[in-house]
Structure formats: structure tokens, C-alpha cells
Amino acid sequence: MRFGDFLDREKSLFSNDVDHHELKLKDEIKKSKFLIIGGAGTIGQAVTREIFSREPKKLDVVDINENNLVELVRDLRSSIGYISGEFDTFTLPIESDEFEILLQDRGPYDYVLNLSALKHVRNEKDPYTLSRMIDVNIFNTLKSLRLSQKMGAKKYFCVSTDKAANPTNLMGATKRIMEDFLQFEESATLVSSARFANVAFSDGSLLHGFQERFDKRQPLSAPNEIKRYFVTPKEAGELCLLSCIFGSHKEIFFPKLYPENDLISFTSLASRFLKSKGYKPIIMDSEDEARTFLHEITDGTEWPCYFFDSDTTGEKIAEEFYTKREDVNLNRFDKIGIVQMKKVLNNKTLAEFMSQMNTMKKSKLLMRDEIKNLIYKLVPELSHKETGKFLNERM
């Protein structure tokens, strides 16, 4: 299945922007050294491919997922092949001493791209994963930025999310706080970011789940009213690359997608997915009925789906890329908008947040409500609705 066909796009959303800047991209990449952190995820692999295909002087990729790193190398070797510059991968966490030694031994790098993130709304369900999400999305970002500054990197890029604009869940709020931390860091290393739409069929996404359910002969399940913007993996890689190379200091790139034309419901995507497989959806009234139906299929043309009204904590009916309070430039690129980061917090508030989180962890006493209250202090616009139910309680 071609991702673009699935999203009714004949070519990449950013093809005009990439074509317009291609010569500058190739020239800058060919003479530069890159470090990609979190390069084994869907977005990380897409960014790695975009850079690798343009012959960088050096490209090192770091991730904690060794299996995905192996597949990344196999994919590049089996498609693009080899480059004249250096290329290698390393199975390391940002928090480790080995990561710092890697930068010491193989650096300095001109560009550092941090694609690592805990991205799922369901991660806010317990204090342990929520604390880890804060570490990965906020503190690890700050650490890798400071290490980049120390070695004299020209540019630091990190990925944000559309959920950071008017957040309704704690995951989006952590990315909003990450943006605030970036705003307060002053150094010679330039910083840019990108707020993403959903990446179609990315690891762990609902669309990826559709493929998994189909392969395992299981029913599809999706919330009725939830709509999302989507980009393909290639588009995700292009957006990151353009922000990294051409983004000015403390700018956030986002795809120019609009609610009247580009928001797509998960239920309609489920129907498109099944149609692409030669099936049509048959709507079930419950999870049990959907699970049972597959054992009773006779003609092989129908696939059970359970669509339900969303009732889980942190869900947002439709995402957005910027707020009314933010300065936005819609003119510099064809299909990319730009938000200029603003200082909305003071440095003392951010330091207190970091100190209180560290105190909680050292005391070995993590409480979800306390962590949530700390987040609220930094993101007062957080519109968070507790329903008492989380996505792990859904099919």
C-alpha cells in the first residue's frame, strides 16, 4: 500500500519545498556531520534515509532499539547502498555515560537531531511511565542540547507534536514544557523543532495497529468522533530535515494542513484500509461480538469493526498546530508554516519543576496527581479531562 494513495495525495506534501531547496540541501549535507538520536523509530528512520541519500560527511544514529537499528541498516544497504562518508549505528540511551563518551570520541557533529520521544497519550495512566515520559521528552532533550552546545554543534533539532498546541493530555503538555525549556536555553547552537501530525502507520499508531490486527485476523477498533491530520513517513522525514537545515533560531515548523480538507476520522481510515485489502467493514455492537465474528466468516468479504464513542482520558477531538497567542508565518514555504517560540515562563519556574521531579524520584515516591499538578503549574492552559478510563482498557 502506498501511503500517499491512502491519504489521497499524489505526491509528497512537501515536494515543492524540497525541490526548491534541493541544491542547498545536498551541498550542506555533503559537507556536514550528523548525529541522529532516536533514529530507529519511524520518524527517525525516515530522517536518516533523507540524510543518507544525500551523502553526508558523517552520519551516526543512536537508539535503544537494537532490532530496529539492524533493520534500518538493512533497509539502507538494500535500497540506497553505500555512501562515501562515514555511517554507523549505536545502541545507547541518552542518559548513559557511553553516550557522552561517543560524542567525545566521534564528535564534534555539525547537526544533532533528537527524534526520541514517548509519544502515546496512554503513557499518562501511571506515575512511573509518566515520570519516564518527562525524562525522555523534557530532561533528555535538555541534556542532549547542552551536550550539543558543549561540542560546538551548529544546529540542534528536536521533534515536538501537534498535541503541544492547546494540550488536552499530559503527553502534549510535556512537549509544550520541552518547547519552553528550549526557549530559555541561550547559546551559539541554533535550535529548531517541528510539530507533527500523525505519521501514517508509524510504530504503535492506530493505523499500524490496523495492519497488526489484520495480519493476526483480529477485528479493527477505533473511536467514532476522533479526527487527526496525517503525514507519510517520507513527509515526516522531509519536515524534520527542512526544519533542521533551514529553520531559524527557535522556530517550530508544522505542515500546512487545514481542518476543512485534511482532518480524517479513524473510522473512515479503517474503512479505507479494509477496502485496500479487498474487504468491507461490518460494524459490531461490542468488542465481544467483534472478536467472535471472525470465527464465523464464510464469504471472506467482510471484516468486523467495533467503533465506539471516545471515553478515555486525554483524548482530543481534533488536533491543531498553533494557538491564537502564537506568532505564525505562513509565507516562507509552500506547505510549511512556522511558529516562533515565545518566552511564556521564567527560568526559576522551570528550575523548580526540574528540582521537584528529581526530589520525587530520589524519595522513591511517585504519585500521579502530584506530577500532574507540577505540569499544570507550567502549562495552565492544559485542558485535561479525567474520565477514569485509559486506552489500555480498550481493544
Report each predicted region and the residues it spans.
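Strand-loop microenvironment adjacent to phosphate/nucleotide-handling motifs in alpha/beta enzyme folds
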Residues: 6-7, 24, 28, 182-395
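Conserved Rossmann-fold NAD(P)-dependent oxidoreductase catalytic core, especially the SDR/UDP-sugar
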Residues: 114, 118-176, 184
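NAD(P)H-binding glycine-rich loop region in Rossmannoid oxidoreductase-like domains
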Residues: 46, 50-61, 77, 83-85, ...
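Conserved glycine-rich cofactor-binding loop
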Residues: 40
